[in-house]
């Protein structure tokens, strides 16, 4: 912390003693000022370091000043110099540095040209936040009293301060003792607590007299410091006296966490189930050699929980005698590697760790993400952690539990057979829904305490079931636990909000405060006084409302009554917000929307009752939860002639029920006519361009799992596409090029095809031409059977057999074409309204459009061309000529010769052939 020195610092043996006013130990007389000035002009040397450059404000002094100061002190007398390693300086913590800087400031304040033990004591008290400051404060020692005592003992200096403020020999001794104390405690840093321990251990000097004057007991202070840094007085006393810490494990304590201790303190979550896995782990740990289980499973299935469960069993004594009394220590590999700047540091740390484990014989090491051992610490010519640990793992000297995912195990550990044979794999499967419910019940109390609310049984059951059904890219119980956690957070935030009445009063308060300030600026003090009184009144009302709300919540919690409650609806809301799939119960508004779906779709799709009804039935079935959960919502193939509304129906459904036409995933299958383009659906294979981008179909469905998927012109696709779609239609799943399973269970699949168009054209001449209903219906049935036969010849039977329904669209009648014409004309009117032009057309013009646009073989597309030619082209010419401008109204009619005329409604118009109408 205090800086890194690349070379040992050579420090001289001479030392400038205390300044004028203080006796020198080698002389009985005071030193004259000339000698003092001469001695101060020379560099000051000491065994550790001499001091720091003076600063006027500690808070703005960067740490680099401390480093550069320490690094700059080198002895000019190299032969007689004593070398001190860099380890002492680089181990100072930020708080220890602050203590030294404050000690220097105290020396300047008192006018002393030295830093003694008393200044270090004042620095320890003044630092305020460290362990040393807290202990001294608890003993009743404050900075003011300590300063008074220091001045009583040594007085004030003459105010002359040298550029470099040195440490006295006794202060230097305190720093050396603090390093020893840190080592004996097993710490690789020097903090404020170690400086205080060094000060107490020195036992003499001004600081000891100050503490004695203030009534502090040094042994009591030491005991409190030891207690606060987690050690016992006896252990440290033995370490100090004997010079060896015996059974202490400083490296393991620094880089590991004792799970057994956490279990004894009740800080671990309860582990429910997993009995077979825990028993297998215990069996492997009891082996003589290669006693290292490796937990392998998908992310989130509870691998770490098994290690925690073992620690809990050990803490309660519910284990065989072979591992009774052992400690489960989880190793932080990141912390172990961090800071190893020089070659050999990482290996040294790891070897120390292994030695401590071997000597203890009661440690079970748990390494989460055990694959990080491979390559950890490896550099040019260095050995990684896995190779260092291999001998100990094989001989049984080190009991290690590893945990990793299946993918990481395959990528890293299986590639190294020597490491793989040292670990015994323990498969951790994903728990079932019922097991997950039991796990959630076991965790319920912890989450209720954290969120300060209660969970119903229905909430826990729905969390397990809904997460299993709708969240497909994660694993139980992790996703179910996350659901109840976020639902608890949502409910807690909802109940913690300010009451609505208080919010309204707060708005009024802000306005009154603004008006009051304005009145003060305009010197209308009478009005400002009235507003101030109103402001105070509102503040009191808001405070009273908030307090009342808090009291009610507290009373509800204490009485065990209603209070915040997480129910099934809250879980459903979280699932919907995660996935976009509506799983909440159907509201009354949505019920009306679903029941009137046919009517709404017919506003855009004219005719085609069979298709509209089939689509509506499937959506209603899925929304109320009656569909097969392992298949898509529905899968249709729309066959029929071109231009009758097959693609339009899919767009209308997406716009009406899913929010917008953009909510639909549309794939034009004419883009997948060649064999090599088929892979674009699921992603390019490894080694090909586009592998990292994912598939067009799979990525779109992963991002939006609840949607309409339209495969337009399906018969244009390469035959390999149909092979790929078999598992989508049957099981609602597809695996992309990266091996990820994409869920299609909440998609509505629509395929359009023109197969059978020729059959419809030949057999449909009678359809819609003044036939009675029975004749129309029988003709449609006959045509449908012919189209289905033709589709069977084109598509493979296993593909057709997986479809829910094959719907044959009818040819459009002239009456239906007229209705479509009105819809298309309305679109033109809306575009002109944006340009502030009001357009009207006559009935005669409509009939002209229908006559030209009606073609049973081509559907409604000729109608669009007729509107473009007869209406849009004529109108564009008039607008360019300036005859129709913004703000005008235009009327489109047909004259006696059949020509289209556009008349400006602002001028006098001749009598129209038929009344003008708007759509």
From Swiss-Prot:
Gene3D superfamilies: 1.10.8.60, Clp, N-terminal domain (1.10.1780.10), P-loop containing nucleotide triphosphate hydrolases (3.40.50.300), UVR domain (4.10.860.10). Residues 506-541 form the UVR domain. One of its GO terms (molecular function) is ATP hydrolysis activity. Pfam families: AAA, AAA_2, AAA_lid_9, Clp_N, ClpB_D2-small. ATP binds at residues 297-304, 640-647. It is found in: Plastid, Chloroplast. Residues 566-757 are annotated as: II. SMART domains: AAA, ClpB_D2-small. It comes from the Eukaryota. Residues 89-231 form the Clp R domain. Residues 1-54 form a transit peptide. Transmembrane segments: none annotated. InterPro entries: AAA+_ATPase (IPR003593), ATPase_AAA_core (IPR003959), Clp_ATPase_C (IPR019489), Clp_N_dom_sf (IPR036628), Clp_R_dom (IPR004176), ClpA/B (IPR001270), ClpA/B_CS1 (IPR018368), ClpA/B_CS2 (IPR028299). GO terms for cellular component: chloroplast. This is Chaperone protein ClpC2, chloroplastic. The gene is CLPC2.
